[in-house]
Curated annotation (Swiss-Prot):
<keyword id="KW-0100">Branched-chain amino acid biosynthesis</keyword>
<keyword id="KW-0001">2Fe-2S</keyword>
<keyword id="KW-0479">Metal-binding</keyword>
<dbReference type="GO" id="GO:0000287">
    <property type="term" value="F:magnesium ion binding"/>
</dbReference>
<feature type="binding site">
    <location>
        <position position="199"/>
    </location>
    <ligand>
        <name>[2Fe-2S] cluster</name>
    </ligand>
</feature>
<feature type="modified residue" description="N6-carboxylysine">
    <location>
        <position position="124"/>
    </location>
</feature>
<feature type="active site" description="Proton acceptor">
    <location>
        <position position="521"/>
    </location>
</feature>
<dbReference type="Pfam" id="PF00920">
    <property type="entry name" value="ILVD_EDD_N"/>
</dbReference>
<keyword id="KW-0456">Lyase</keyword>
<feature type="binding site">
    <location>
        <position position="123"/>
    </location>
    <ligand>
        <name>Mg(2+)</name>
    </ligand>
</feature>
<dbReference type="GO" id="GO:0051537">
    <property type="term" value="F:2 iron, 2 sulfur cluster binding"/>
</dbReference>
<keyword id="KW-0411">Iron-sulfur</keyword>
<dbReference type="InterPro" id="IPR000581">
    <property type="entry name" value="ILV_EDD_N"/>
</dbReference>
<dbReference type="GO" id="GO:0004160">
    <property type="term" value="F:dihydroxy-acid dehydratase activity"/>
</dbReference>
<feature type="binding site">
    <location>
        <position position="122"/>
    </location>
    <ligand>
        <name>[2Fe-2S] cluster</name>
    </ligand>
</feature>
<dbReference type="InterPro" id="IPR004404">
    <property type="entry name" value="DihydroxyA_deHydtase"/>
</dbReference>
<dbReference type="GO" id="GO:0009097">
    <property type="term" value="P:isoleucine biosynthetic process"/>
</dbReference>
Length: 618
């Protein structure tokens, strides 16, 4: 049988000092033979998705004690990508993912913890904790804070005829839209983010929390049940019960199937990618899945994403890919288990993956897929509805829909027969501009833009591109190229939500493309191609593009090509190399880069490997 990891600090004569310190935290002699569970919280008042988490750690801890364990809570950092967006603060977002993973590892290993419950929610916190879980490989349960309710407003330009549903992205685009009055802009700003929780569309945070369900490390409903709803309280209580059950299976019955690397294995990662493709999730999720797979020593690459994207249908469009459906609507339609049920009926899923419920995926679908479900309590959980009341309190309302959305013809989730497309909501493109691949969220691309050819407008920072867009320097038909914004070149791989949102504000989103070695917010739509690998700072071809060069993007052919001769490119390469130590750096960018970000840039790899540390340098 595996020994409790905690016995290193709780057993033996020479650990008297450690036990004395444990006692000073509230433990007693009877606790030294119990499983010690870390409750890894991420409460902060800086982030709406985490502002309500102050007391939920106590709920989990109390349930762990009731079930015979000892709970010890600590906190990680959390950055709000929306508040950090559009200025130098975004340089810190992606690096914070690795800091979170490291901080969890440090606390868990320093104190020899036996198991952990991860209370996450927003963009980099869930993947950072996932990386830590796979790195540490101790019994782990994830439970997220839940999505925000969508906003709602009646605007004068609609003649007061109907309410318009809103998300954060509407506030950003309205700020630069000359056709929206100041009064309407203010109303949108006031109502776009009405409650606590992760932003209300299928953005990065909600995409990741959905993927945790199919990876097997979180309960059904984790990604879609609203933060404000009373039912979410039971999820936190369940997390305490589940972690004690998993811990006993491992430490007392030597059942290693409950460990994260055995639950979230290669098949589970492929299932997660298929879910992401089917629901048109954020492209950031690919970055995080690739990084997490490396932590778990799982062979999962961009080639796998490419292969799966060609056979998985696109079954769901949620904001920002739709102005009709938001996370509360997705939950009403059965959430993650609803989509997985449709994929299972297509014969696409690996059905025998395992999860924290101590069930196979197939058995879980039989219980939780609302098309099959006979359990009235589960149906009641999926009927959890928004209240439309501004609040930052969790579990503060108990509204229910009168009926579930089981319409698979024109509802929030479609069947394969009525899919938006048969080849998925995400695609990997290859070509001379991206020999190691790049990503596009096809769920947000209209059919007319899926083949696009245009002249390049090149910018060496996000800020420069925003200024050009807002001052009319970008025209219909252009391909906006934003480079030196990759993991190394930024450094930090900023999200390009402001450039894409302002293209939309200026009426150019249906007439232009944008490509970058940076990344995109989950709120991005339009023909936005990111994660171009290798990045400019790693001598990628995107660093040699000049204004006016023709770029050809073809999603159906999965290609992205710079139409410049090899002879011309060779000359440009030699000119770039002649810059010496300044080669493959921006020629005219004014950006202060801190010591910590410079250290990050020294070790980080390009996006095709998840922007993880280059272990060959260690």
């Amino acid at each position: 049988m595996p020994k409790y990891r905690s016995s290193t600090t709780t057993q033996g004569r020479n650990m008297a000092g450690a036990r004395a310190l444990w006692r000073a935290t509230g433990m007693n002699s009877g606790d030294f033979n119990k499983i010690i569970v870390a409750v890894v919280n991420s409460f902060t008042q800086f982030v709406p998705g985490h502002v309500h988490l102050r007391n939920v750690g106590k709920l989990v801890s109390e349930e762990i004690y009731i079930n015979g364990g000892v709970a010890k809570e600590f906190n990680t950092i959390a950055i709000d990508d929306g508040i950090a967006m559009g200025h130098s603060g975004m340089l810190y977002s992606l690096p914070s993912r690795d800091l979170i993973a490291d901080s969890v590892e440090y606390v868990i290993n320093a104190h020899c913890v036996d198991a952990m419950v991860c209370i996450s929610n927003c963009d980099k916190i869930t993947p950072g904790m996932l990386m830590a879980a796979l790195r540490l490989n101790i019994p782990t349960v994830f439970v997220s804070g839940g999505p925000m309710e969508s906003g709602s407003v009646t605007l004068s330009r609609y003649n007061n005829s109907s309410d318009v549903k809103l998300s954060l992205v509407d506030a950003i685009t309205a700020s630069a839209n000359p056709n929206i009055t100041d009064i309407d802009k203010e109303q949108i700003e006031l109502e776009a983010c009405p409650t606590c929780g992760s932003c209300s569309g299928m953005f990065t945070a909600n995409s990741m929390n959905c993927l945790m369900e199919v990876l097997g490390l979180a309960q059904p409903g984790n990604g879609s049940l609203l933060a404000t709803h009373f039912d979410r309280k039971e999820m936190f209580l369940n997390a305490g019960r589940y972690i004690m059950n998993l811990s006993r299976l491992y430490y007392e019955k030597d059942n290693s199937i409950v460990l994260p690397r055995n639950i979230a294995n290669k098949m589970a990662f492929e299932n997660a990618a298929m879910l992401d493709i089917a629901m048109g999730g954020s492209t950031n999720t690919v970055l995080h899945l690739l990084a997490a797979a490396q932590e778990g020593e799982i062979s999962f690459t961009m080639k796998d994403i490419d292969r799966l994207s060609r056979k998985v249908p696109h079954l769901c469009k949620i904001a920002p890919n739709s102005d009709r459906y938001y996370m509360e609507d997705f939950h009403r339609a059965g959430g993650v288990m609803g989509i997985l049920g449709e994929l299972q009926r297509c014969g696409l899923l690996y059905e025998n993956t395992y999860n924290i419920l101590n069930k196979s995926l197939l058995d879980t679908l039989r219980q939780y897929d609302i098309k099959l479900c006979q359990d009235l309590e589960i149906k009641r959980m999926y009927a959890a509805a928004p209240a439309g009341v501004r609040t930052i309190k969790p579990f503060s309302q108990n509204n229910r829909w009168n009926s579930l959305d089981i319409d698979r013809f024109a509802g929030c989730i479609r069947s394969q027969e009525y899919a938006y497309s048969q080849d998925g909501g995400l695609a990997v493109l290859y070509g001379n501009l991206a020999p190691k691949g790049c990503l596009v969220k096809t769920a947000g691309v209209i059919s007319e833009l899926k083949s696009f050819r245009g002249p390049a407008k090149v910018y060496e920072s996000q800020e420069e591109s925003v200024q050009a867009i807002l001052t009319g320097q970008v025209c219909s038909g252009d391909v906006v190229v934003i480079r030196y914004e990759g993991p190394k070149g930024g450094p930090g791989m900023q999200e390009m939500l402001y450039p894409t949102s302002f293209l939309r504000s200026m009426g150019l989103d249906l007439h232009c493309a944008l490509i970058t070695d940076g990344r995109f917010s989950g709120g991005t739509s339009g023909l936005s191609v990111g994660h171009i690998s290798p990045e400019a700072a790693s001598a990628g071809l995107i660093g040699l593009v000049c204004d006016g060069d023709m770029i050809n993007i073809n999603i159906s052919k999965r290609s992205i090509v710079l139409e410049v001769s090899d002879y011309v490119l060779k000359n440009r390469y030699e000119i770039e190399i002649s810059r010496g130590t300044k080669a493959w750096t921006p020629s005219c960018r004014n950006r202060d880069v801190s010591f910590s970000l410079k250290a990050y840039a020294k070790l980080v790899t390009s996006a095709d490997t998840g922007a993880v540390r280059d272990r060959s340098q260690l």
